[in-house]
């Protein structure tokens, strides 16, 4: 048994020293020190020895087990250190290599269209008015001639937060708030109201549950329909080209009377008829009209003395028509490949 223990020790230590990875080392531990290993078998045979031999052989067996355990532990530390060093080496970053340049953002197409319209109206003497996106039901509907039982409320589904508050469905509430607090001793009202609006539409190529609007409002003495037509003509020619013609069609909006929708001559075919204008030669752009007397009175304005006009359009629609964008969702995906198509790298302009 003495020779057997010595042979086992030499053989095991040789294999432990030659182990190249932690898995191989663990296999050797199981092989020599496991429940079915030779060391266990030797310990079981101790009972067959004489009383004189048993202490000596037991002590030697324990020394061999201890030596193998220490050899495995020492080798394990070496292999773990080597593994860590190899990992660090493979993950080393060469700081002298050129870095990956971050993608540079550009001004969004929708932002550019909105700013273009804002600049145009500011040049015409308009001011920019803003209001809350979480709006009172009163300003979103009732102040705009849509009482609680008005059938026109069924024309648009809304995101209600409480019984009396909702995400505004239009920027018209800003007009109502502006009229309510305006002091005509300082001049007429002349504002545009750009901002986000929300409706319960299913998102598709032409609809979005969140989009933007720009509405305009002018209220003062002797404001006529001719003033509205002149303003819309300037808007059409500025945004779509000097050669554009406009057409006004009778329509209905609860907050204006009379109400009209404005079409422009197709910029693609020049009015001859094509896919863009659906063969009609005209493209619908916006809704407008003279401010309804009820709306003026609700805001505390004397409708026998003051009159006004209002209009509203969607910058998304303008952008899609002007730059041939076929899906409104492209405007909201934050894809730089899309955005950069509409911006000059030198001037930052469209």
UniProtKB/Swiss-Prot annotation:
GO molecular function: ATP binding; catalytic activity, acting on a protein; magnesium ion binding; phenylalanine-tRNA ligase activity; transferase activity; tRNA binding
PROSITE patterns membership: AA_TRNA_LIGASE_II
Cofactor note: Binds 2 magnesium ions per tetramer.
Cofactor requirement: Mg(2+)
Keywords: Aminoacyl-tRNA synthetase, ATP-binding, Cytoplasm, Ligase, Magnesium, Metal-binding, Nucleotide-binding, Protein biosynthesis
Binding-site residues for Mg(2+), renumbered to this chain: 257
GO cellular component: cytoplasm
InterPro entries attached to this UniProt entry: aa-tRNA-synth_II, aa-tRNA-synth_II/BPL/LPL, Phe-tRNA-synth_IIc_asu, Phe-tRNA_ligase_II_N, Phe_tRNA_ligase_alpha1_bac, Phenylalanyl-tRNA_Synthase, tRNA-bd_arm
GO terms for biological process, alphabetical: phenylalanyl-tRNA aminoacylation
SUPFAM superfamilies the UniProt entry points to: Class II aaRS and biotin synthetases, tRNA-binding arm
Localization in the cell: Cytoplasm
Enzyme category, top tier: ligase
The enzyme's E.C. designation: 6.1.1.20
Major subcellular site: cytoplasm
UniProt xrefs under CDD domains: PheRS_alpha_core (cd00496)
Signal peptide (from-to): none
Reaction catalyzed: tRNA(Phe) + L-phenylalanine + ATP = L-phenylalanyl-tRNA(Phe) + AMP + diphosphate + H(+)
Subunit details: Tetramer of two alpha and two beta subunits.
HAMAP family attached to this UniProt entry: Phe_tRNA_synth_alpha1
UniProt cross-references to NCBIfam families, sorted A to Z: pheS
Family according to the record: Belongs to the class-II aminoacyl-tRNA synthetase family. Phe-tRNA synthetase alpha subunit type 1 subfamily.
Name recorded for this polypeptide: Phenylalanine--tRNA ligase alpha subunit
Gene source species: Listeria monocytogenes serotype 4a (strain HCC23)
């Amino acid at each position: 048994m003495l020779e057997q223990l010595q042979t086992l020790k030499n053989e095991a230590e040789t294999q432990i020293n030659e182990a190249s990875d932690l898995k191989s080392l663990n296999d050797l531990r199981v092989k020599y020190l496991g429940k079915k290993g030779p060391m266990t078998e030797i310990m079981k045979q101790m009972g067959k020895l004489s009383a004189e031999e048993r202490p000596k052989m037991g002590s030697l067996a324990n020394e061999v087990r201890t030596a193998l355990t220490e050899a495995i532990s020492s080798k394990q530390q070496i292999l773990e250190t080597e593994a860590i060093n190899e990992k660090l080496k493979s993950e080393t970053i060469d700081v002298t290599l050129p870095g990956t340049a971050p993608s540079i953002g550009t001004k969004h197409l929708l932002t550019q269209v909105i700013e273009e319209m804002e600049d145009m109206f500011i040049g015409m003497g308009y001011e920019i008015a803003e209001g809350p996106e979480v709006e009172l039901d009163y300003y979103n509907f009732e102040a705009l001639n849509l009482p609680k039982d008005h059938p026109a409320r069924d024309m648009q589904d809304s995101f209600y937060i409480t019984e009396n508050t909702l995400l505004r469905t239009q920027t018209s509430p800003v007009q109502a708030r502006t009229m309510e607090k305006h002091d005509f001793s300082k001049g007429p009202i002349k504002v545009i109201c750009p901002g986000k609006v929300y409706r319960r539409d299913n998102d598709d190529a032409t609809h979005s549950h969140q989009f933007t609007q720009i509405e305009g409002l002018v209220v003062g003495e002797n404001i006529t329909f001719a003033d509205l037509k002149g303003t819309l003509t300037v808007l059409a020619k500025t945004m779509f080209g000097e050669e554009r013609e406009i057409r006004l069609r009778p329509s209905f909006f609860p907050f204006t009377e009379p109400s009209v929708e404005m079409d422009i001559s197709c910029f693609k075919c020049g009015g001859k008829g094509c896919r863009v204008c659906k063969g009609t030669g005209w493209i619908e752009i916006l809704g407008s009209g003279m401010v309804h007397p009820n709306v003026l009175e609700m805001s505390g304005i004397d409708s026998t003395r003051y009159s006004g006009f209002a209009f509203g359009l969607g910058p998304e629609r303008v952008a899609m028509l002007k730059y041939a964008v076929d899906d409104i969702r492209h405007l909201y995906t934050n894809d730089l490949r899309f955005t950069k198509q509409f911006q000059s790298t030198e001037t930052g302009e469209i």
